[in-house]
Each structure stands twice: as C-alpha cells, then as structure tokens.
UniProtKB/Swiss-Prot annotation:
Signal peptide (UniProt feature, chain positions): 1-18
Species per Swiss-Prot/TrEMBL record: Manduca sexta
The protein's name in its UniProt record: MD-2-related lipid-recognition protein
Localization terms from the record: Secreted
GO biological process, any: sterol transport
Length: 151
C-alpha cells in the first residue's frame, strides 16, 4: 500500500514539474491596475531556456490573472508575430477556459491547450495573449512571452 502512495506521489510530482513557469512581460496596452497577470505556465517549457514547441503536438498554457473589474463575459485572442491573430484563437469565449463572472481583486486561472500545426514555420517568436471584457475593452489583461517552434 505504501508503494502505491509513493507511485501516485511521483506521478503527481512529474505532472507538476512538466509544466514550468515561463518568462513573460505585460503588454504596453494593458494596465496592471486594471488586470495583472501573476504567473504563466507552459508545457513544454524549461525555465532556463525558451519554451520549445514541437510541430504536430499540443502545448498547454495556463496563467494566473487578477482582474480589477467585474464582467459576466470574457473574450480572448492569441496573437503571433506582428500582432497577427491565430485563426483558432480569435475572439474566443474565454468563459470556456476560466470562471465567469469575474470578481474585482479575485485571482483566476485560464487553462488552454493549443495544437502546434505542422505548417507553422520554424523559428523563435514572441506571442501575445489578450483577455478582455467585450462590453468595456479597456478592461483587459495581456502578456507576451517567447517560444520556439521546431520540427
């Protein structure tokens, strides 16, 4: 029985370690007084290197944010280089991936799994993630992080 507990603990620890904190910074257009991103976790990601995504597999992105606004609806968009929106992640109902309504000053987590398409070009990119109240677009959270896509 003790061996089973150790096995479960090791499995849980392995899952926790697989998703690492990513280096990120807030977007210029977002005010931390309105919404602050506290932590970004990406799998696969190594905190000592860039997050490296392999084509043809899924990557999971999770981030903690604290909105200072109340909203019953949230919309999210993922932007690639040159602020080009990803087709699959444009004006998506974010309430599918985090709790709605938001409450001012209450931390939340957004979890999303993204397929890394085989047609995406290899290279190192900065992407931007925006989350906002569609009824008041100045109420937004936003961060940027750098990833690498490889074969």
């Amino acid at each position: 029985m003790a061996a089973l507990h150790w096995l479960l603990l090791a499995a849980l620890l392995g899952c926790t370690l697989a998703e690492e904190q990513a280096i990120f910074y807030n977007c210029e257009e977002a005010s931390e007084a309105v919404c602050s991103v506290k932590e970004v976790r990406i799998n696969p990601c190594n905190p000592n290197k860039k997050c490296i995504f392999k084509k043809g597999v899924n990557a999971s992105i999770s981030f903690d944010f604290e909105p200072n606004f109340a909203s019953s609806k949230l919309v999210t968009t993922l932007y690639g280089p040159f602020d080009v929106e990803f087709d699959e992640m444009t004006n998506v109902d974010a309430c599918q991936y985090t709790k709605c309504p938001t409450e001012p000053g209450k931390s939340q987590v957004l979890d999303y799994t993204l397929y890394i398409g085989k047609k995406l070009p290899q290279g190192t990119y900065t992407f931007k993630w925006k989350l906002w109240n569609p009824e008041e677009t100045s109420q937004l959270c936003c961060f940027k992080t750098t990833i690498k896509i490889r074969k």
